[in-house]
């Protein structure tokens, strides 16, 4: 947190430099500039992805790649980075989490990009370990000599404490020469590692690492920017001449554990602010490659002004003939009740969980067990509440009927499903009370994630009598009824 405060202080104090210009452009009234460049064609991208990459290439100050669910945001961002490297020798690529940094780094490595991963190696995934600074340093051709010198220095240090005065003087002289050589080797290794890297990749906080002191970058790319704290973004922006933000501020925001901090504005991200302040910098990716169009359409209408479209090859994808892609199972007449089990785990609705598992088993039976195993048809069970998730996991573990399919069934919270997809998704909304209270189901970004994870079949279980008081859920109910999915 100290690093974030220091970054914010630098931003506030900035005057007459590039950081001040970026601050006034991103958050103030200074106009975002764009170069006049001849558009680059990318036949393997769709038109909105191509437009987004070209906007990144033209931007003098800031560009935003707004990637709704399934629209190929990562593909677009990798292409933008790859193309930028034809114009700049090196870029900085950051994200809030190590997982997100590793994900984009893996995609860049697959494209043949030389990535140098900065950060704690224990938090880096196995595939990216060989690209960490520490591993690259140890694998450098000059490292054996440096290791040998360090070993000799340790041995000489022991002898110096035991020897005579004349011996100690000779040893100290030798140690001084060795230290100078070791320093020269370290500098040479570091220089070669950083000069040869096309991409320096780190979390936003780790961009303040001592190894990056004094280094500047023409372009900073921030992936999953909609989940990044604004203060963390400024840590990295201090090192850059321009910034590219990629993400979706209509999905999950950063995790803020302090309710007062969230209410005070910490939950509102830099990407959200810049998208509102500089709409000319935003490129919306409009073609999605995940969902049947009936699953996609409600999210598109509510969150993205109806601008999303399903790619032709997946527009009518399905598992069963004569099946409805979206189903809402209304539990209003079933007398189900939620239970509060504590602040940590939230609420549970056991009867709704039992019904969900019954519906899951019935759907598996309709598809056919052998087909599910042969085609690896996978299922996701989502609930906003940890207690419901744990209860469902326990019931699945004890179910003999579901045992053959356990490896194909994932149960998690909405947050745990961010960035994932499954062939079939069941959502348990849990809330069922006479007061119409829905708690943090009021956070519609969370629901946007939940209803956009399914490729071919989405089943929602919830009490319409409770949820229907909220305009979002009322319209979702009406939409599902319209596409003939309501039961």
Model regions and ranges:
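Walker A/P-loop
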Residues: 60-80, 419
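Conserved beta-strand position immediately N-terminal to the Walker
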Residues: 63-67, 91-92, 379
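Alpha-helical nucleic-acid-binding subdomain
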Residues: 78-220, 232, 257, 271-272, ...
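The Walker A (P-loop) glycine that initiates the GxxxxGKT/S ATP-binding motif of P-loop NTPases
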Residues: 67, 120, 224
């Amino acid at each position: 947190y100290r690093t974030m405060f220091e970054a914010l202080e630098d931003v506030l104090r900035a005057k007459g430099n590039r950081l001040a210009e970026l601050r006034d452009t991103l958050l103030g009234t200074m106009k975002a500039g764009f170069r006049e460049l001849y558009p680059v064609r990318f036949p393997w991208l769709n038109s909105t992805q191509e437009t987004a990459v070209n906007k990144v290439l033209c931007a003098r100050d800031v560009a935003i790649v707004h990637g709704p669910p399934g629209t190929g945001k990562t593909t677009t961002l990798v292409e933008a980075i790859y193309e930028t490297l034809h114009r700049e020798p090196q870029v900085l690529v950051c994200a809030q989490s190590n997982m997100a940094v590793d994900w984009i780094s893996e995609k860049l490595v697959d494209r043949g990009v030389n990535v140098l991963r900065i950060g704690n190696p224990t938090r880096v995934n196995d595939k990216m370990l060989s690209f960490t600074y520490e591993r690259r340093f140890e694998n450098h051709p000059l490292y054996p000599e440096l290791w040998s010198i360090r070993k000799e220095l340790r041995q000489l240090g022991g002898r110096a404490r035991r020897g005579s005065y004349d011996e100690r003087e000779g040893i100290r002289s030798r140690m001084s020469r060795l230290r100078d050589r070791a320093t020269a080797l370290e500098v040479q290794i570091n220089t070669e590692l950083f000069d040869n890297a096309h991409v320096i990749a780190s979390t936003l906080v780790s961009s303040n690492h001592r190894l990056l002191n004094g280094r500047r970058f023409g372009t900073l790319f921030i992936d999953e920017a909609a989940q990044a704290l604004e203060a963390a973004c400024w840590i990295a922006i201090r090192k850059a001449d321009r910034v590219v933000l990629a993400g979706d501020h209509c999905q999950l925001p950063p995790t803020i554990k302090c309710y007062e901090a969230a209410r005070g504005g910490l939950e509102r991200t830099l990407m959200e602010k810049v998208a509102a302040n500089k709409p000319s910098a935003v490129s919306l990716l409009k073609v999605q490659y995940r969902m049947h169009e009936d699953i996609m359409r409600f999210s598109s209408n509510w969150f993205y002004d109806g601008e999303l479209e399903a790619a032709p090859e997946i527009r009518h994808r399905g598992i069963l003939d004569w099946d409805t892609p979206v189903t809402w199972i209304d539990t209003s007449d079933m007398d189900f009740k939620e239970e509060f089990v504590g602040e940590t785990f939230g609420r549970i609705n056991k009867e709704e969980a039992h019904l969900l598992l019954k519906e899951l088993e019935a759907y598996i039976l309709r598809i056919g067990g052998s087909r599910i195993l042969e085609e690896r048809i996978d299922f996701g069970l989502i609930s906003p509440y940890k207690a419901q998730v744990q209860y469902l996991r326990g019931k699945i573990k004890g179910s003999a009927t579901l045992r053959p399919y356990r490896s194909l069934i994932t149960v998690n919270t909405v947050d745990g499903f961010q960035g994932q997809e499954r062939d079939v998704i069941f959502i348990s909304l849990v809330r069922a009370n006479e007061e119409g209270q829905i708690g943090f189901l009021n956070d519609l970004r969370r629901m946007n994630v939940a209803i956009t994870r399914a490729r071919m079949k989405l089943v929602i279980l919830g009490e319409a009598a409770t949820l229907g008081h909220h305009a979002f859920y009322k319209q979702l109910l009406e939409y599902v009824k319209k596409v003939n999915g309501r039961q």
